[in-house]
């Protein structure tokens, strides 16, 4: 309504907030929320009988006057609504959602680090997160998830606009100053509509007493917002997760790695290091065990993680320990569910734990987000879409959530919808490299190489950003001009990062492919031999890593070792199936199509492509875009099939996705 008022040049003083609220109520979609009489409209406009009786004589004239006031109020609201919608019709601009914002809603901005030691920024982040976590466990509040806050400053000037973007009525700002074991926390609660200060306080405590600050702040905010707390919620707000300040400090350091906007292999390793230290210092620290389990399961699942049996076992043990220590800890239940989802692909058990967690974490976006992932793996595309939308209502500016929603559309080859989601990401993080690379990968899949080249040209991804780097290499290969990228790849691989594991070998496979496209057969053979050595060294500890197995199969085809390649392709097909995973299950089929084409087995390659071209899935190479007719036309790996009429028909077709 505020935005519409500005568009129509209505002075704020002439449209009090109470009138805007009354208009919103009259126009509510839910009939039960609308005023049911003129008197109720008058009451909403603060013209209730309690206000008007002192000015009225008793008797019938009082009733008539009340009706008159109510009638005038109603007509005024109708007139204002007419002005509102008249302007909307004339200008056809989006309407602010401020009218729908619940009063008991809050977002907590990043806390400012005022410590002299700037390395203490992790502590300020942690205090913000812990206060938010406590509030999010109150069912009567709407609390925006932390991940939507990451791209805001600690004390921005445009609080009303930020609140509108997040769909909340209140904002909490704060600062933290840490010196040794002394901590000062300053907070202030602001009503966003008029940028007014509702409550604030300063807390000076020792590190060992920091939990009391988090509890007091959460309780004060709940009181200010008039939230109704159950007995269980009061206990949760007052809970002390550990009695060991060193363990809590290590936990906050690990948490800081997890809240970084860009997640990389390095951030995962950093988080694991500090979380292991936290639970070593306090083996009864359930929250620490829960986060360690979640990080491990995430690392096991996501490319370029290292899905080793050791990481999977640590995720299991950490999750079990967390649930045993605190059976009603929502974070522990989520971690247990994520272990079953990511490590075992036991979706039924995963959903059971996620559903259990809901009653303890009513504001957690991670629960519907996790349910979206489960539905996607089961091929329940519409259900996944719905869960992503539910998560977005709790976490509207979560870059990872928006990206994952875009990936759902990419897997379905619904590229326009994917691009809209990616543009939302870029509105929040304009220079996000992975998002730009994904947009370029979509352009490649649509056959628009000039568009993808323009997006990729300014980017300088490093080895750790392997998806973006491989998208650049693929661009050069599709253009059949990879000479420049070969030089960059050699430079990157001259000092390989050991934390990347098998990804170094994967990049050497790409180097060999690029060299082969330029006609440097000898150089390609040398790169592939080195790639094979590096990839094979990880196979024993990652026996079910179908991406690693597929990379190794294609490398062996490049080296002319068909028997080894066929054995690996069969192994990849057994490591993951469509029945177990609708997204990743088709990846071995793409490896087979590429491998069969390279070996000259047209029949097997074309049969595989006929399956893939209408199947939703996550692509085998680069950014994970599925094969499209345009990519069949452009990709040199399919050159051996070009004279076959069946392949030509596939390459000339329009992609029609069978999402059943």
Which ranges hold each PLM region?
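C-terminal lobe helix-coil module of Hanks-type protein kinase domains
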Residues: 1-54
């Amino acid at each position: 309504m505020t935005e519409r008022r500005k568009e129509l040049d209505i002075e704020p003083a002439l449209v009090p907030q109470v009138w805007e609220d009354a208009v919103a109520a009259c126009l509510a979609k839910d009939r039960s929320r609308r005023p049911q009489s003129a008197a109720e409209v008058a009451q909403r406009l603060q013209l209730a009988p309690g206000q008007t009786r002192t000015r009225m004589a008793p008797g019938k004239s009082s009733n008539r006057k009340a009706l008159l006031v109510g009638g005038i109020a109603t007509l005024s609201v109708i007139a204002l609504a007419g002005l509102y919608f008249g302007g909307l019709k004339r200008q056809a601009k989006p309407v602010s959602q401020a009218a729908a914002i619940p009063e008991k809603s809050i977002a907590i901005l990043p806390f400012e680090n005022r410590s002299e030691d700037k390395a203490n920024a992790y502590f300020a982040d942690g205090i913000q997160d812990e206060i938010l976590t406590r509030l999010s466990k109150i069912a009567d509040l709407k609390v925006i998830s932390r991940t939507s806050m990451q791209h805001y400053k600690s004390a921005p000037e445009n609080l009303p606009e930020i609140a509108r973007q997040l769909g909340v009525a209140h904002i909490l700002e704060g600062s933290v100053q840490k010196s040794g074991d002394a901590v000062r926390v300053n907070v202030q609660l602001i009503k966003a509509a008029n940028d007014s200060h509702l409550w604030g306080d300063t807390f000076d405590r020792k590190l060992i007493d920091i939990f009391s600050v988090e509890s007091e702040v959460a309780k004060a905010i709940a009181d200010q917002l008039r939230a109704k707390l159950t007995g269980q919620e009061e206990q949760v707000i007052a809970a002390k997760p550990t009695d060991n300040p060193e363990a809590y400090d290590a936990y906050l350091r690990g948490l800081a790695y997890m809240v970084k906007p860009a997640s990389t292999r390095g951030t995962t390793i950093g988080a694991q290091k500090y979380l292991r230290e936290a639970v070593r210092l306090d083996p009864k620290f359930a929250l620490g065990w829960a986060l360690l389990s979640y990080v491990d399961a995430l690392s096991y699942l996501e490319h370029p993680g290292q899905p080793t049996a050791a990481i999977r076992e640590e995720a299991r043990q950490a999750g079990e320990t967390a649930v045993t220590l605190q059976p009603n800890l929502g974070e522990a239940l989520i971690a247990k569910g994520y272990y079953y989802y990511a490590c075992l692909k036991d979706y039924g058990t995963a959903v059971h734990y996620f559903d259990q967690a809901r009653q303890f974490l009513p504001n957690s976006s991670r629960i519907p987000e996790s349910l979206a992932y489960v539905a996607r793996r089961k091929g329940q595309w519409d259900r996944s879409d719905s869960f992503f939308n539910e998560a977005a209502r709790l976490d509207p500016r979560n870059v990872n959530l928006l990206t994952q929603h875009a990936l759902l559309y990419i897997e379905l080859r619904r590229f326009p919808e994917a691009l809209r989601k990616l543009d939302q990401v870029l509105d929040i993080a304009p220079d996000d490299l992975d998002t730009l690379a994904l947009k370029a990968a979509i352009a490649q899949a649509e056959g628009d190489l000039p568009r993808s080249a323009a997006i990729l040209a300014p980017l300088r991804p490093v080895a750790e950003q392997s998806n973006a780097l491989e998208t650049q290499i693929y661009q050069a290969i599709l253009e059949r001009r990879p000479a420049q990228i070969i030089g960059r790849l050699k430079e990157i691989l001259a000092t390989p990062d050991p934390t990347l594991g098998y990804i170094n070998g994967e990049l050497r496979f790409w180097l060999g492919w690029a060299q082969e496209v330029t006609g440097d057969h000898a150089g390609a053979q040398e790169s592939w031999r080195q790639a094979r050595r590096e990839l094979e060294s990880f196979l024993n500890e990652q026996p079910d890593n179908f991406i690693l197995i597929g990379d190794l199969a294609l490398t062996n085809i490049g080296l002319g070792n068909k028997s080894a390649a066929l054995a690996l392709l069969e192994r990849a097909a057994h490591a993951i199936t469509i029945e177990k995973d609708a997204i990743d299950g088709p990846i071995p089929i793409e490896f087979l199509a590429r491998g069969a084409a390279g070996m000259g087995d047209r029949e097997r390659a074309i049969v595989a492509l006929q399956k893939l071209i209408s199947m939703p899935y996550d692509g085998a190479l680069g950014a994970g875009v599925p094969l499209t007719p345009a990519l069949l036309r452009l990709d040199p790996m399919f050159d051996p099939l070009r004279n076959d009429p069946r392949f030509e028909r596939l390459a000339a077709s329009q992609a029609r996705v069978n999402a059943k």
